[in-house]
Amino acid sequence: MSHYDQQYNAIIQKIIESGISDEEYQVRTKWDSDGTPAHTLSIMSEKMRFDNSEVPILTTKKVAWKTAIKELLWIWQLKSNDVQVLNDMGVHIWDQWRLEDGTIGAAYGYQLGKKNRTVNGQKVDQVDYLLHQLKHNPSSRRHLTMLWNPDDLDGMALTPCVYETQWYVKEGKLSLEVRARSNDMALGNPFNVFQYNVLQRMIAQVLGYELGEYIFNIGDCHIYTRHIDNLNIQMKREQYEAPKLWINPDIKNFYDFTIDDFKLIDYKHGDKLTFEVAV
């Protein structure tokens, strides 16, 4: 069984047993199918920690891992907010949040693409600054990226759930700590935990570092009420050994990665489970 499955099931069980309901409040989220309020059970401040001896991907259900990586490339490599660009990759997970101009506004990739840092007298964006600093100033305690920009929040189709990364270089190993203000455990968490670990592996490879720790912090950790039944089914399923992630070792530039440079080997998993989307 995988370490991720074990940590995931423990958090799900904790939410079901002791999570606090928000049904007494008006909520922003609505069910995509019928427009009624989408309520949750939630707990606060959970941490998932991995030593990177295995790839953190669920085995109790099938996770669309290529879709997760494509979304990662859209945000971190292309720094795009254009939903059509994602559609052209065959991915439609952001369609419900598409604004009239076809984008998700000033969210996610838009923030990473803003040239607000300076390297050698040239303005660069957060990703390029991070890559430069990790390579040339590894001992710094300032290796962060931030998607939560108060100046732009009102112009975002959806404020970022995963909003911050912090990177550490110790003894030649690259560690990553991720912070999510809010995480939907049925749909969001399996994608986010996997894709940010892929990001860590990509950056470690192009900069020549070994893998260190991977930590995923969650502020509001919740389950939507319509997801509880299927999550109970999922928790009872057999867990399998984690698969291996192959990343093309010939890629030495972060911007050269394509979806064809990733393979998930020996991914054994339970059947797909459907969870309704709340928007």
Curated annotation (Swiss-Prot):
GO terms for cellular component: cytosol. The keyword Calcium does not apply. This is Thymidylate synthase. Homodimer. It is found in: Cytoplasm. Its main location: cytoplasm. The lineage of its organism: Bacteria, Bacillati, Bacillota, Bacilli, Bacillales. Pathway: Pyrimidine metabolism; dTTP biosynthesis. Its EC number is 2.1.1.45. GO terms for biological process: dTMP biosynthetic process; dTTP biosynthetic process; methylation.
